[in-house]
């Protein structure tokens, strides 16, 4: 049976249809908002997956180009691997949903969000997030806590829910909020140095709208939802857990209280070895339970240490940052480099400057755009002392790179101020938590070292949270390390400048965050950020005055847009000639802005002169130094500007009578000529005679003076 339900969000209809499409899926939901439509299919395996200690949830976000009436480019003509943006959207859908599944649920669950129609005013990723939650609620899968999602913009001090395409261009904030009826589950934001109080108010503004959407989903689930399948939860064998606990708890506690990471890990390895010797032969079919028992003890010790003893595993105060250091100009041949170290987390960032044309073109289901600033993040296995094959970037690396890019992008100078494409690569050399935020700091160092005139330096920090089972007690931690992230309840990343926030990413392992927790995390993050910025400023307090001698030189000029065709020439003949003769790269914008990228000053200036020549208007009455290109019986043809020739009639070659053109000029001679006429057909008539007379008159005037 087909069911249709709808509500209104920000003055537009949010509509769902369930039961018509995808009949063999557990739930296939067709959800629309304006003319944007996403088909969400959810399915789960009938039995739990054996031999794993995590919940196997898979979120896929698929963009179909037919959604915007496009045919894929390239030879194959079909969609390939997901774009980076699709991967980021899938990760964003995963984060608020995963904590709301029952603990111990081990069935494979797959959520596939296929974007099938898009209008640019209504974002498909926001619709997909709402659709994924609603589809899970309607299915037989044991998911019963709806999540509402909205985007929030900020224009002239006013918050806007789900801004349209035009409003998004004007907005200084791009905020996504996901929440249940009770608590915020996920936050993702990018902004132009948003003050902390304004950011908090924006989150709360979005939260109120999320509550309404979650309430709508709850009512739809109660009216149309399938009966939930019988819940099979993985539970550790109670007897084995008791035995392992009695044998090892004191050893685990002693090991976890060691403040040095390497010593603590070594001590825990010894504990695990003793437990293995004691129980592996006794319970050969329950090795997973034995490992889980050890994990639960570690988690209990760490959380009790923080909540009840008010201390952290490494001995720091709750608001204390690990030791910091910064360094620049590490690599002699790169355009800019920076090394940022926070405790055992260390990131080296390297900046490269290129021509405007080397920016990245973004062509997908949204309007085609390009970006000048790119950030890529690499997390090799050696950064955690492990051995793994080196592959291409995984979803986590793409996500962390995008977050650090979002944090820096609002601070990059405009194309007119700094006409370069910029790429920063952050290499994680050592990881003990918060590498994405260390990448923000490393990027700042590298950009300043490269001479990029950033608006202000930026830094990032990760805040953590530990709560009691009843959520009554909670402690917020500044600058979480790996152990606190692993056993904690929240990863609250905040990046920005001394003026305000440029990026936030928040996810949680519990059923949401209290408003007080969000406010305190944002406030404490600012204090930590200012401390880090002080360290960065002590290392390099302003951009280098000049770019590296190894960086390309960029020259700019403006030409009349109507002359662009003259500079390019038929089939690109003219512009290719300039490139061949000078070895430069040339980018011309529709408004007539010209960017010339050269390896040295001389070739850049030569290219500018040639472009100026091709784009200049020939004017009557002006005198030019031209080159004779051809001789005829009736006169000489002279090139006065690149690609622009005129005729000097034999009668105009000299002040005295000329019988033969060759008596006065030869091909290749440079002569002064005056433009006497541009006829109705655009032909240019020149006179050497008039140019000579003008020159003599000017000399006479100078003599009189």
Curated annotation (Swiss-Prot):
Class of enzymatic activity (EC top level): transferase
Keywords: Cytoplasm, Magnesium, Metal-binding, Nucleotidyltransferase, RNA-binding, Transferase
Any one GO biological process: mRNA catabolic process
Domain of life, per lineage: Bacteria
Cofactor names: Mg(2+)
Location of the KH domain: 552-611
InterPro entries: ExoRNase_PH_dom1 (IPR001247), ExoRNase_PH_dom2 (IPR015847), ExoRNase_PH_dom2_sf (IPR036345), KH_dom (IPR004087), KH_dom_type_1 (IPR004088), KH_dom_type_1_sf (IPR036612), NA-bd_OB-fold (IPR012340), PNPase (IPR012162)
Any GO CC annotation of this UniProt entry: cytosol
Main localisation: cytoplasm
Example GO molecular function: magnesium ion binding
Localisation per UniProt entry: Cytoplasm
Pfam families linked: KH_1, PNPase, RNase_PH, RNase_PH_C, S1
S1 motif domain span: 621-689
Binding locations of Mg(2+): 485, 491
EC annotation from Swiss-Prot or TrEMBL: 2.7.7.8
Catalytic reactions of this protein: RNA(n+1) + phosphate = RNA(n) + a ribonucleoside 5'-diphosphate
Primary role: Involved in mRNA degradation. Catalyzes the phosphorolysis of single-stranded polyribonucleotides processively in the 3'- to 5'-direction.
Protein family (similarity comment): Belongs to the polyribonucleotide nucleotidyltransferase family.
Protein name (record): Polyribonucleotide nucleotidyltransferase
